[in-house]
Amino acid sequence: MATNTITTTKVTTTTTDVTGLSLIAAHSHISGLGLDDNLQPKENAQGMVGQLSARKAAGVILKMVEAGKIAGRAVLIAGPPSTGKTAIAMGLSQSLGNQVPFTALAASEVFSLELSKTEALTQAFRKSIGIKIKEETEIIEGEVVEIQIDRTITGGHKQGKLTIKTTDMETIYELGNKMIEGLTKEKVLAGDVISIDKASGKITKLGRSFTRARDYDAMGPETKFVQCPEGELQKRKEVVHTISLHEIDVINSRQQGFLALFSGDTGEIRPEVRDQINTKVAEWKEEGKAEIVPGVLFIDEVHMLDIECFSFINRALEDEFSPIVIMATNRGVSRIRGTDYKSPHGMPMDLLDRSITIHTTSYTADEIRTILSIRATEEEVELSGDALALLTKIGQETSLRYAANLISVSQQIALKKKNNTVDLQDIKRAYMLFLDSDRSVQYLEENADQYIDDYGRVTIGQESTDGSTQPQAKQQEVAQPEATQPQSQPEDDKMETD
């Protein structure tokens, strides 16, 4: 009697999530300044909450930048920590869009071993100035009727003919090697609508003609159908290229300078090169070939700059090619770096006199609750009502940044318990595990003798005879130079005096 055996094979499928480049950052939820058409700030719009007067002032700056006629102005955003100074600058950047150059720079980035301070600031200034270069090109635009390519037996020189048409006319063009390679690379077939730049020979595939929409053919979802062009085949078209002054500097600073744009190894650029470029750009502007677009340079933590950098900014603001400089600081009356003088916001008085100041104020409890709710939505975390209330209280007593950081930590604690909603206990657990700045300072003061001080000394506890731990001042020196004792001279060298 035969026995049938059934074998079951278990197949395990592993799915790997590929993380994209759009990670959640501190200000990724901000998409603008949250203003209406009359520059009136909304209470909660485009990720911005509160700071109504500061956002309205930033809206005025936005209109100045969009007008493109005013440059060389300095704006200072000053306020306590965690009051949204950087958020206002990011909202301004989002509102300007991609057409206006916006360069964000931390003041500590200026200090480098590869570049001098003035060179780093000069490059940042010139990155914030855009040049719109207008160029008229002749293009051939039409629908491909037929492509005929003749190859020799030896496989050498290729020849071909391209039949192209519009709704009004049809023409046959002779093709050379370069054009045949371009058509093959773009995978141009009969029925495609293409555009050919006569000067450079660049071929652009615009789409597929509507007349071929019903053809039996395999097409991908990205296939775009367009109308067959009308009128003449050869047309003149104005093309606008947008480039920054810094990119022009790098390209002209050395042979194959355009490669340095991708590697980032620009190095020091000679002033003579920049002067020649400024002269040429001024000529293009007078001839109507180019248009200067003053952008925005944002310097965060500006109090970290020293007196030489502030002096350079004073001079650079008076230059012809100068952007609008926005600075942010959270310092009060503090010492100017590089000097022994104290000044408001750690900046020299002459630069403060040139700047218009926007002040930010601390957030209220309702505003903190709204911001934390927006952050939770951005991070895809579901908070219970009690958890949001506790986070709001923590944000009031500590800082908004600390409360926002607890959101993702609390989510991991909740997921460990297989809960999709973060509740009150998860927030408490995260609060006990991770200290805020005040509790960290308190712990440090209570246990200061167990940490190494400025002189490399540390007190280590030693167990006494009765079992208790008694602190013993055992000093461990960390690379401390020993004081040199004067050596005793030999008896013969001593001089006796009567």
UniProtKB/Swiss-Prot annotation:
Gene Ontology molecular function, alphabetical: 3'-5' DNA helicase activity; 5'-3' DNA helicase activity; ATP binding; ATP hydrolysis activity; DNA helicase activity
Gene3D superfamilies recorded: 1.10.8.60, P-loop containing nucleotide triphosphate hydrolases (3.40.50.300), RuvB-like helicase, domain II (2.40.50.360)
Record: residues binding ATP: 79-86
GO biological process, one term: regulation of transcription by RNA polymerase II
Pfam families per the UniProt record, alphabetical: TIP49, TIP49_C
Family note: Belongs to the RuvB family.
Function: DNA helicase which participates in several chromatin remodeling complexes, including the SWR1 and the INO80 complexes. The SWR1 complex mediates the ATP-dependent exchange of histone H2A for the H2A variant HZT1 leading to transcriptional regulation of selected genes by chromatin remodeling. The INO80 complex remodels chromatin by shifting nucleosomes and is involved in DNA repair. Also involved in pre-rRNA processing.
Protein name as catalogued: RuvB-like helicase 2
Species name: Candida albicans (strain SC5314 / ATCC MYA-2876)
Gene behind this protein: RVB2
